Amino acid sequence: MEKGRIVLASASPRRLELLASAGVEFDVCASDIPEEPIPGEAPADFATRLARDKAVATAARTEGRWFVGADTIVVCAGEIMGKPVDEADAVRMLRKLSGVSHEVITGYAVYDRERDGLLCKAVVTKVVFKPLRDEEISAYVATGCPMDKAGAYAIQGGAAYMVERIDGSYTNVVGLPLCEVVEDLRRIGAL
């Protein structure tokens, strides 16, 4: 499927697995940018800004033609939830998500170094959690799984049973809206 050199600007094993599952050939070069929202920044703008910054920063330090950056956040009752800072934060996040609807937003960006072109989009999926008991939350947090996940959960892992329903892209909740990303890569000539 390769037409040019695509670089995934992410260390996320979930993004790597998703992109590879679509038959896309790519290299990986993790980006390291600050992930702090600007005061007043809308959640989708925050996620797409981080995705753009990851793609462009990676392009500045490695070879390639197209650079794909992505960032996933969870938004619940107006709070942007990134990765928990510690176990207590993970417990707090899961308690807040318990029994309510929230949004998972993944911003993604594709930077074309040759044309100096940039495509940025955000994909939103609505997720509803079942009401969670404190012992369920404690047991899940004790696994360590929530610690590197936005909103402190992985739909594809131990938290799958917590999800009553989703409206939108499942792969977006995992960390990369695969349908949209692959279609955009095709549309711009990367695939």
From Swiss-Prot:
Keywords: Cytoplasm, Hydrolase, Nucleotide metabolism
Main location: cytoplasm
EC number from the UniProt entry: 3.6.1.9
Any one Gene Ontology molecular-function term assigned to this protein's record: dTTP diphosphatase activity
Site (Important for substrate specificity): R14, T72, Q156
Subcellular location: Cytoplasm
First-tier enzyme category under EC: hydrolase
Gene3D superfamilies recorded: 3.90.950.10
Cofactors named for this entry: a divalent metal cation
Family: Belongs to the Maf family. YhdE subfamily.
Protein name: dTTP/UTP pyrophosphatase
Origin species: Geobacter sulfurreducens (strain ATCC 51573 / DSM 12127 / PCA)
Lineage: Bacteria, Pseudomonadati, Thermodesulfobacteriota, Desulfuromonadia, Geobacterales
